Regions:
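One-carbon transfer enzymes
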Residues: 1-206
Length: 206
């Protein structure tokens, strides 16, 4: 019986975290869920090509020229069509409203490039996070996968992985190390953990 949990990945750019998820699905790290849909807020995102190469359905929902409500409705329509149960934010650059998040309680996960509660919340994204860590002088940083709620980076933590900061690090070098040594490892592992728990709950009801 194939009762895998349907996953959608929301993207805006190059899709390196999406690729990590696709690779994890191929290699058997993600077995309880299946990526059924990739939704991009940018029609030119290379992530769409990655999805296409992996034979995954795609949808483009651009924010430009429409209200937040219309933008979110277009995403919800795409998700509902594929009966999506878990949403993974992988470099998705749009903020989702509290109303949207409430529709998927503890079903939306995000990866943040620091050890929350450090260097997180409003204004902390991309290279800014790594610059802040270097400016502060911390010796260890990392990545966190957490559930998404209405507070930026405020949802319950699912997994964390630490990464050492080296003496001559720049924000760019540190970003690459955190991606390779933390984000690409814990995002697929956390997606599997969440899907496995949902699958077990579904099986209990059968």
């Amino acid at each position: 019986m194939n009762n895998k949990v349907n996953i959608a990945v929301l993207v805006s750019g190059g899709g390196t975290n999406l690729q990590a998820l696709i690779n994890a699905q191929k290699s058997g790290i993600i077995t309880s869920g299946e990526i059924k849909l990739v939704v991009s807020s940018n029609k030119n995102a290379y992530a769409l090509k990655r999805a296409e190469n992996a034979g995954i359905k795609t949808a483009v929902c651009e924010r430009k020229g429409i209200s937040q409500k219309e933008f979110e409705e277009s995403i919800l329509n795409a998700l509902e069509k594929e009966k999506i149960e878990v949403i993974v934010l992988a470099g998705f650059m749009s903020i989702l409203s509290a109303d949207f998040v409430k529709r998927y309680p503890e079903r939306i996960i995000n990866v943040h490039p620091s050890l929350i509660p450090s260097f997180c919340g409003e204004g902390f994204y991309g290279l800014r996070v790594h610059k802040a860590a270097l400016d502060y002088g911390v010796k260890v940083t990392g990545a966190t996968v957490h559930f998404v709620n209405e507070i930026p980076d405020g949802g319950r933590i699912i997994m964390q992985k630490a990464v050492e900061i080296k003496e001559n690090d720049t924000p760019e070098i540190l970003q690459k190390r955190v991606m390779e040594n933390a984000e690409w490892i814990i995002l697929p592992a956390a997606a599997e953990k969440v899907c496995k728990e949902i699958k077990e709950r579904k099986n209990e009801r059968i």
